[in-house]
Amino acid sequence: MRLYPAFFKAAFSWMDPELAHTLGFAGIKLAHRTGLGRVLSRVTAPDEGAEVNVMGLTFPSPFGLAAGFDKGATGTHALTQLGFGHVEIGTVTGQAQPGNPRPRLFRLVRDRAVINRMGFNNDGAEAVAPRVAAALQTLAQESIRTGRRRPVVGVNIGKTKAVGLEDAAADYVRSTRVLAPYADYLVVNVSSPNTPGLRQLQELDALRPLLLAVRAEADRVTGRRVPLLVKIAPDLADEDVTAVADLALELGLDGIVATNTTIAREGLGLRTNHDDVAACGAGGLSGAPLRRRSLEVLRLLKEHAGEQLVLVSVGGVTTARDVMERLDAGASLVQGYTAFLYEGPFWAGRINRGLRRAAREGR
């Protein structure tokens, strides 16, 4: 019997979503500090047979937590104890910023979705970098102690709101300079709808010099090749999706994260009352309604790029079956986030058990 849905309804459904997130994350970190997280990890951890080798990295499993949950690397170790094979930190910007005014996070409970216009609220790259370094050190020590594979830690970087588009590349380079030395991989986020003008950076004339600058800086400051990916929006036309894929291939990027949240409200099959959705205002919608388009983009990218790009699929992932569907469609890695808010702290563990059953049954 699953108790979390009833607990969510009683404890969180009446609460401001952002406050609920803060309290829930605090609970996860408390479990870690008290040693409960270590106990939980014995039942949530993926099987050793679930390991995947991607971008020169070994992931304990193909399923991880998307950017947006742990924006400042304040609970990375705690999150890995819940069973995620990787955690993507961020989005982190070159400068600290408070994000957009509240309220800025809204639930569509009937659709198991959320609308957010957070606006990259974060502490800035210079504050986050030492936390990432500390998390990696702790995870490495735990890996030695337990003999289990260390979860992978990626970092997602975005543009500071106060920085103009003409200076965007320099802002991304600033983040790269301090974060790349500690990131297992880097994701360039040019697809959030909540920073004015950001999605214009998906246009090839703007994206090419930005990615070249980030690649060069990552190589310069690390002395190693840090895997580099770009995260795209589901709202791109198909021809623009393939154009970004061609650019990624041209520049030697490692992969594409597909997709971010959508600004669409029509054509998603929403069950929430139209007026209630409209009352939420602007922002990116994530969760179950994004599943179809996210899968479409994944299949399009796989058909276009074949094995030449690593594809990380995110958007509408809730169950182990969803994860397997994305892997079968060509994803190397799969991420989730919104379902975590509805499914609770044992969500990744349930997905790992589902993947384990599927492997035993030869699926």
From Swiss-Prot:
State where the protein is found.
Answer: Cell membrane
Q: Which UniProt keywords apply?
A: Cell membrane, Flavoprotein, FMN, Membrane, Oxidoreductase, Pyrimidine biosynthesis
**GO cellular component labels:** cytoplasm; plasma membrane
| E.C. designation(s) | 1.3.5.2
Q: What's the superkingdom here?
A: Bacteria
Q: How does it sit in the membrane?
A: Peripheral membrane protein
Cofactor names from the entry are: FMN
Entries under InterPro entries matching the protein: Aldolase_TIM (IPR013785), DHO_dehydrogenase (IPR050074), Dihydroorotate_DH_2 (IPR005719), Dihydroorotate_DH_cat (IPR005720), Dihydroorotate_DH_CS (IPR001295)
Q: Which GO terms describe its molecular function?
A: dihydroorotate dehydrogenase (quinone) activity
* GO process terms (BP): 'de novo' pyrimidine nucleobase biosynthetic process; 'de novo' UMP biosynthetic process
Instruction: Give the positions the UniProt entry annotates as the active site.
Output: 192 (nucleophile)
Asked if the keyword Flavoprotein belongs to this entry, the reply reads: yes
Q: Return the cofactor note field.
A: Binds 1 FMN per subunit.
Chief localization: membrane
Pathway(s) where this gene product acts: Pyrimidine metabolism; UMP biosynthesis via de novo pathway; orotate from (S)-dihydroorotate (quinone route): step 1/1
Q: Where does substrate bind?
A: 71, 116-120, 189, 194, 260-261
The reaction(s) annotated as catalysed by this protein in its Swiss-Prot or TrEMBL entry are: (S)-dihydroorotate + a quinone = orotate + a quinol
* Purpose of the protein: Catalyzes the conversion of dihydroorotate to orotate with quinone as electron acceptor.
Subunit (UniProt):
Monomer.
Q: Give the family per the record.
A: Belongs to the dihydroorotate dehydrogenase family. Type 2 subfamily.
- What name does UniProt use for this protein? Dihydroorotate dehydrogenase (quinone)
Organism from which the protein derives: Kocuria rhizophila (strain ATCC 9341 / DSM 348 / NBRC 103217 / DC2201)
Tell me the gene name. pyrD
